[in-house]
């Protein structure tokens, strides 16, 4: 078509590779990668990472989200797929629907070496004298190339721990607790030409229900990931300013607590074993975008 796709940053980011594209959240980089990759390969990889299907959480009402394809659009909407829709899907916009749980699972699979994880609220249900139910822990390899995963993990580290990264102001300063992650902003709607003429120039000048959603996914510690987290703040604005600080506070608190807990257990002579599960049960599907910079 005749549409022009712009980056969130006026003037763009210049020459960009994977690390810079992720670290500085360059829309145009991901538009180009999506164009070269195509919607079918994007959809196939998204499903491997946990999108587009229920994950099996131990609660009713889990939503599957949606990963679109040419076949889906022809069946549901009755028209063929367009290249511009591939570009939008490449940054999680358009028809894409995700849940906070899926975002956290995606992050876990990216940083744990490409192993499928099955999210559970509990590991075991135990009566007074026996285990009543034990949740199955899946350890299926989803077939990702280790060197590719290492590149993504390094880029997510730079998002938070390199000064040019979009979440640098939300970094955890204690070296052993450092987190990596990715900021995102899910656009609710564009500012119209008429609104711009009336001096409505910024997203936070729109009515609250029409403002962008703030997103961040993260993991910690960077060197040996143990925790994955997703934060979605509806109508919160930019992910770097709103969602990333929440993830930082949670991940730092959990790690500090576990260090103190293990120290207390060791001093009492008990084995220092900890099982921590953090879950966001707000699994409403929403339109999401994970390349839009902020």
Tell me the role of every PLM-derived stretch:
Residues 25, 233-235:
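Short, histidine-centered active-site or binding-site loop motifs used for metal coordination
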Residues 1-228, 279-280, 287-294:
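Beta-lactam-recognizing serine transpeptidase/beta-lactamase-like catalytic domain environment
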Residues 131-140, 246-294:
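Short, gly/Ser/Thr-rich active-site loops of penicillin-recognizing serine hydrolases
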Residues 215, 230-233, 246:
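C-terminal soluble interaction/assembly domains
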Residues 144, 209, 235-246:
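Short alpha-helix boundary/capping segments
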Residues 224-227, 235, 269:
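Amphipathic alpha-helical interaction segments
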Residues 103, 118, 239-251:
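Short, charged, low-complexity patches
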């Amino acid at each position: 078509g005749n549409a022009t796709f712009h980056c969130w940053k006026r003037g763009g980011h210049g020459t960009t590779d994977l690390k810079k594209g992720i670290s500085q959240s360059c829309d145009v980089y991901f538009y180009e990668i999506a164009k070269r990759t195509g919607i079918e390969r994007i959809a196939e990889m998204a499903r491997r990472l946990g999108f587009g299907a229920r994950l099996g959480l131990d609660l009713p009402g889990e939503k599957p989200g949606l990963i679109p394809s040419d076949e889906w659009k022809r069946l549901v909407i009755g028209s063929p797929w367009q290249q511009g829709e591939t570009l939008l899907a490449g940054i999680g916009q358009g028809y894409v629907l995700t849940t906070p749980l899926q975002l956290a699972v995606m992050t876990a699979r990216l940083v744990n070496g490409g192993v499928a994880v099955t999210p559970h609220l509990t590991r075991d249900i135990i009566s007074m004298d026996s285990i009543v139910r034990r949740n199955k822990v899946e350890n299926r390899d989803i077939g990702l190339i280790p060197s590719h995963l290492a590149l993504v993990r390094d880029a997510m580290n730079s998002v938070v721990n390199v000064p040019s990264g979009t979440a640098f102001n939300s970094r955890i300063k204690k070296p052993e607790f450092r987190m990596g992650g990715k900021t995102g902003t899910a656009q609710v709607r564009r500012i119209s030409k008429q609104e711009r003429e009336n001096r409505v120039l910024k997203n936070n000048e729109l009515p609250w229900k029409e403002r962008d959603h703030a997103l961040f996914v993260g993991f910690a510690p960077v060197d040996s990931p143990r925790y994955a987290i997703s934060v979605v703040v509806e109508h919160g604005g930019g992910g770097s300013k709103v969602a990333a600080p929440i993830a930082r506070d949670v991940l730092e608190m959990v790690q500090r607590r576990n260090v103190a807990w293990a120290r207390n257990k060791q001093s009492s002579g008990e084995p220092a074993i900890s099982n921590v599960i953090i879950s966001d049960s707000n699994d409403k599907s929403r339109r999401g975008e994970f390349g839009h910079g902020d």
